[in-house]
Amino acid sequence: MVKINGEELNIAGKTVAEYLATTKYDPKRIAVERNGDIVPKVQYADTVLQDGDSVEVVSFVGGG
């Protein structure tokens, strides 16, 4: 199980890019943290989520 934003999901073995494709997140407007480290956008397709990972997806919103 992978914990994403506090929710346990059975997505071990998928890449960050594969997970994001199943969500409504806009990859241009988010940051992904995996086990305390920011995942660079260029590595989303190569970063495989593993059992026990803790992931936070943070969305950026405009404002003023």
Tell what function each PLM region has.
Residues 1-63:
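Ubiquitin-like/PB1-type beta-grasp interaction modules and other compact soluble beta-rich domains
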